[in-house]
Amino acid sequence: NVSIRTKSIISQIKPTEKGGFNLSVGGQMTHCQSLVVASGGLSIPTLGASGFGYDIAKQFGLGLLPRSAGLVPFTFSDWVKDICETNSGLSIDVEMSVNGVSFKENLLFTHRGISGPAALQLSSYWKSGQVISINLMPDQDARALLLRYKESNPKSLLRNLIAPLLSKGFTQSLQSRYWPQHAETPIAEIANETLENLASQLSNWKLKPSGTEGYRTAEVTLCGVNTDNISSKTMECKSQPGLYFIGEVLDVTGHLGGYNFQWAWASGYTAGCYV
């Protein structure tokens, strides 16, 4: 028989001398031989996420690694936010990098910052205060492209040449920031050194996020219960027989694409084979 209890709060968990656990559930005592903690992380609290699983880990003396939001949009509070807000809804293909890790995927501008697969993936490797790099032309050699435009389209304005690659609105935003003095200057009259500096901005756009959207919109919680304390064969706690941890509550985080769901299902199945 399987009893499913909804809207129930576990207020106390006590291991017994004969094995198993006594649980206080909604004011009633329940005994179980095996206890599987599948509480998830802190992400999206409006769906009921909480630190309950971490509290259980602390109770039984298990190591916890510092948690933070992962697979989450970046936010900005300076002029970058103005650019993002102006171009909110625009998506472009980029390559984003931080700490030696790069993702070549889609970037989406929002009214508060940047999102999309590239930004979400990178957020799991970013630390507060770090600068990120964005290659706005990942399939082009920006320097060679601008110098080639100078030869082939000498009378054209720089923004009109770049717009087909980055969109008219975003190119206008970049122009206002990086080459306002050459807004109406034919590219043939712009010095090669200036074009090379602009190419560096396009291929290595350095931005410093003010933060992220946090757990409110994060798809996962980074870190959690130290896996050194958990058997990779059974998901059972090494120091407390009968206690299992599975899914996101553990220090396991996957990339976008269903990997975190797969981890939850696989670790749950594994524990289910041994309880």
What is the predicted function of each stretch?
Residues I44-P45, P73-F74, T110, I114-P117, ...:
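Glycine-rich phosphate/pyrophosphate-binding beta-alpha loops
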Residues Q12, L42-P45, G116, W126, ...:
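Glycine-rich nucleotide phosphate-binding loop and flanking beta-alpha elements
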